[in-house]
């Protein structure tokens, strides 16, 4: 893999969908924060599994079943290593949403009581809001929010003030905002939460695809993320957890594979991580996720971060040229990931996205599963461009050119 002196990546050919044309024009995919495109190595790994190794795992003693189990558990080991985690504290879930719900259910219902506080931030995805709302409604605990400043950042002073009250039982926060692009200082936040005697959870859905992640260095109690945003398949997510916390937790779901013994009136539980993986696993998806982290590891996440930082800086500079366009979030690329939300004055974001689609420029428009943040920002919705390792400056130029045409079409309101 060759790079330029600016650490740009040249991997577009690895992604089959990037060769697609619509109406004779190339696809400009700028919605990686919603889901990433998949390299051919991921597609082939899943195809190869189904063609040559398909069997259920953790059950059969015949060679095909053992081969499937080895592929699945080998993928788990590589996923754990990719994020600096231990294999047996790396739990496969359906997605990041399920991983967070697992914590809310299996940990929260044992530890959170009336009078306690669950602390989250105004920038959270609904997946890191609604499970805590449900928990607080059930237990009588209070849900509080850290404010988002006008520049899209959080205040650690406010975090300290909330923790000083002594009632915070759990704090949950995004590694990278899916709307603002803000990169939060999650290691520092987790350290302050632990010092106050509380538990922390990081939603890494946008962090793992964009940044080098070492869950040991971050040192949160839980770190949740999803495969499909990190070049992997849909249908699989990951929860990394602290061993002593996971061992003390009750299971999330009941059924096969998560048990050690079952009697007529009671059961005993399997070891980690299988205690939290009831039923037949997402085997092909696990194999695909293993291939995805192999691909990212081969690229080197430092290079991925450098590429997206440079592309984001270029995009911020180019977007500043578009009349009546306002970028929302941190002002420079150093403080944000490869996510840029914006509004074009007088034009609804959905109209912007529809017009860009005519040029095959794919962006997201809406509340981005972050309605409370939209209220904080005072907007009903935003348009959002987000980048992956396959994007280039030419994609940004196409975005800006298309936005200029949209601006000309609607005129100044």
Give the ranges of each region predicted by the language model:
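Pyridoxal 5′-phosphate
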Residues: 1-413
């Amino acid at each position: 893999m060759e790079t330029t002196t600016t650490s740009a990546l040249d991997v577009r050919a690895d992604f089959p969908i990037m060769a697609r044309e619509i109406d004779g024009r190339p696809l400009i995919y700028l919605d990686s924060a919603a889901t990433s495109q998949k390299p051919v190595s991921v597609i082939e790994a899943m195809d190869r599994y189904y063609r040559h190794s398909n069997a259920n795992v953790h059950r059969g003693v015949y060679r095909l079943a053992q081969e499937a189990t080895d592929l699945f558990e080998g993928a788990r080991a590589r996923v754990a290593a990719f994020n600096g985690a231990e294999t047996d504290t790396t739990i496969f879930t359906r997605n990041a949403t399920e991983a967070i719900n697992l914590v809310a259910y299996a940990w929260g219902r044992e530890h959170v009581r009336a009078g306690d506080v669950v602390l989250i931030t105004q920038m959270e995805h609904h997946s890191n809001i609604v499970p805590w709302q449900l928990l607080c409604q059930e237990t009588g605990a209070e849900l509080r929010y850290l404010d988002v400043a006008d520049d899209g950042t959080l205040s650690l002073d406010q975090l300290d003030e909330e923790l000083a009250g002594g009632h915070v039982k759990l704090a949950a926060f995004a590694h990278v905002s899916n709307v603002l692009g803000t990169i939060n200082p999650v290691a520092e936040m987790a350290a302050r939460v632990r010092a106050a005697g509380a538990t922390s959870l990081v939603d890494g859905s946008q962090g793992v695809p964009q940044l080098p992640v070492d869950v040991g260095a971050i040192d949160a109690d839980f770190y949740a993320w999803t495969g499909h945003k990190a070049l992997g398949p849909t249908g699989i997510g990951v929860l990394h957890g602290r061993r002593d916390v996971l061992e003390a937790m009750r299971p999330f779901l009941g059924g096969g594979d998560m048990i050690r013994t079952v009697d007529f009136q009671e059961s005993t539980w399997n070891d980690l991580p299988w205690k939290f993986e009831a039923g037949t696993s997402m085997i092909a998806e696990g194999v695909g996720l293993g291939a995805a982290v192999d691909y990212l590891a081969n690229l080197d996440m430092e290079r991925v971060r450098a590429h997206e930082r440079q592309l984001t800086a270029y995009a911020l500079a180019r977007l500043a040229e578009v009349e009546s366009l306002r970028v929302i979030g941190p002002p420079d690329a150093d403080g944000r990931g490869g996510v840029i939300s914006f509004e074009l004055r007088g034009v609804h974001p959905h109209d912007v996205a529809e017009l860009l689609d005519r040029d095959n420029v794919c962006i997201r428009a809406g509340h981005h599963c972050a309605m409370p943040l939209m209220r904080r920002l005072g907007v009903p919705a935003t348009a959002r461009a987000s980048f992956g390792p396959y994007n280039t400056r030419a994609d940004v130029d196409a975005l800006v050119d298309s936005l200029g045409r949209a601006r000309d079409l609607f005129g100044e309101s």
